[in-house]
Amino acid sequence: MPAESGKRFKPSKYVPVSAAAIFLVGATTLFFAFTCPGLSLCVSPAVPIYNAIVFLFVLANFSMATFMDPGIFPRAEEDEDKEDDFRAPLYKTVEIKGIQVRMKWCATCRFYRPPRCSHCSVCDNCVEEFDHHCPWVNNCIGRRNYRYFFLFLLSLTAHIMGVFGFGLLYVLYHMEELSGVRTAVTMAVMCVAGLFFIPVAGLTGFHVVLVARGRTTNEQVTGKFRGGVNPFTNGCCNNVSRVLCSSPAPRYLGRPKKEKTIVIRPPFLRPEVSDGQITVKIMDNGIQGELRRSKSKGSLEVTESQSADAEPPPPPKPDLSRYTGLRTHLTLAANEDSSLLGKDSPPTPTMYKYRPGYSSSSTSAAMPHSSSAKLSRGDSLKEPTSIAESSRHPSYRSEPSLEPESFRSPTFGKSFHFDPLSSGSRSSSLKSAQGTGFELGQLQSIRSEGTTSTSYKSLANQTRNGSLSYDSLLTPSDSPDFESVQAGPEPDPPLGYTSPFLSARLAQQREAERHPRLVPTGPTHREPSPVRYDNLSRHIVASLQEREKLLRQSPPLPGREEEPGLGDSGIQSTPGSGHAPRTSSSSDDSKRSPLVKTPLGRPAAPRFGKPDGLRGRGLGSPEPGPTAPYLGRSMSYSSQKAPAGVSEAEEVALQPLLTPKDEVQLKTAYSKSNGQPKSIGSASPGPGQQPLSSPTRGGVKKVSGVGGTTYEISV
């Protein structure tokens, strides 16, 4: 019955217990009212006292067996059985006194039942040492109330026997008054007692046997130890003493407590929180902090109610101080996006508008990850306007753009000077030659002498997609020339040759190490590679054709010499990155048309796979002195020798394209002439070379070309 609290009331459950109580109390009351007075007179006054004591004992045990907790185990909470439920095996085995005893998993209570424990289907609880569920007491009989149930049976049997015996004695004494009321009530009580005596006496005898053998009704009925040994028995006397004399078992369920309502008087009220003392604890991506904000309680309540509907905070921004390359690329992307959205932005990509701000110190020239390697915008306005100032203030000028003059502002057109013989687009190098470890890994594998490599197809795609340069026009990414490029052994550069992409310090170190004498080799004739006119505009094609006509009219140069490494490798050396010295004034450069600013005479790169590969001259190879005048040469090239028997058209075709892989190499912080620092090239010319001719000296002829181009040729 204690388990019934809090559950739905079922009247049928109380019918047996109510009938038992009525018969017990009613029959005993009639016995004491009609039979005991006559027995006290006829037999002894102790008869009513004895029956009263036995009746009280029966009533006490009945009450204890009905209302006492039989030993119910509490059910597992939801957080306790998360790991065990739906994955636990049905049985677990434990060993008790050397005998294996199974423990069954209870799906209702969600735990393994201890030995001798069973789940009561009526009470819906697991009861320790479950015996049976008795409907006469409306309770389960378990470890905690089995003693009272057993004593109830014993006392009830004794009481029934007493009532029946003393009633029979009363009838025998009053045989003449069988028609009387007292004798009739006594005979009725005897019938009730006689009817209940048979089942109660039989049940009592059964439990006496179970107690003596140390078993429960459930174990006896199910036959768990029918063919084996009971591990729970301790002998007859010990079993009886354990049931009757042992201390009561502990209670596993707490007693229900009623909630107490306490009235709080004004002295015990909580103080009001002021608006300035509200402490808000925030959590921002794992960082907790306390902020004191001047907010009212109403605003905090509104914020709390809207917190469930608010969007999550944005992810934290990356730490740009830790990743130099990421910071550089983000800066480039932001600047390029802002430039593309401008009103005066040209339709072509604007990568030429960026140039690296190099420092004149050796540290910034040698370390590409320094802070001076950030790409700046607008520094070109500070460039020196004369060659003398540019030699004192070394810096790099950006590559020429193919944009029309109408799309460029006057300031921008003046800040980027054009070099007619500048080769290759370095827009990719301006954007990606600084700041990332991936590009440093490429710099270690790229050859500084300008030889092409087989793995520049992906970088060529970047050049095509990222910038519009002269190389991307001559050799598109889908050209088969990309597929046929093969890397060969790196030729030894000639004396006085300096890579145009090395820093000043590295160039000086390598210049001191290279002193091999030049060995003249025989020239090799080869047809020039045809120029691809597919991607060129009409004006550029006309300029190229005009220059080719001029080159065909010029006579071939007498004996040229090749550098020693090119005779065997079959790989042409790059004639520098196209920083030829400027001889015209800055005013002439600013007035030139966009067509003049496009490098002319840059045919497509020839295939390298043929055995009789193209072999051109190196930048530092000596040339004979004054030769017949020919067009298409600047004064920086007039002081060098050319291989004999090779026409100028072939020589122009020998100039290779600057591959995108070469664009990634580091550039020196000095203005260059023919790939060499101007100070070095002018101060110490190599053997077999003549000093550069000045435009003011004799022997220099100026020839006007297409579009107002002026060529200065040594005679």
UniProtKB/Swiss-Prot annotation:
Modification sites for Phosphothreonine: 303, 348, 350, 411, 436, 659
EC number: 2.3.1.225
Membrane spanning stretches: 14-34, 39-59, 149-169, 192-212
Superkingdom field: Eukaryota
Function: Palmitoyltransferase that catalyzes the addition of palmitate onto various protein substrates such as CTNND2, CD36, GSDMD, NLRP3, NOD1, NOD2, STAT3 and S1PR1 thus plays a role in various biological processes including cell adhesion, inflammation, fatty acid uptake, bacterial sensing or cardiac functions. Plays an important role in the regulation of synapse efficacy by mediating palmitoylation of delta-catenin/CTNND2, thereby increasing synaptic delivery and surface stabilization of alpha-amino-3-hydroxy-5-methyl-4-isoxazole propionic acid receptors (AMPARs).
Domain notes: The DHHC domain is required for palmitoyltransferase activity.
Name by which UniProt lists this protein: Palmitoyltransferase ZDHHC5
Organism: Canis lupus familiaris
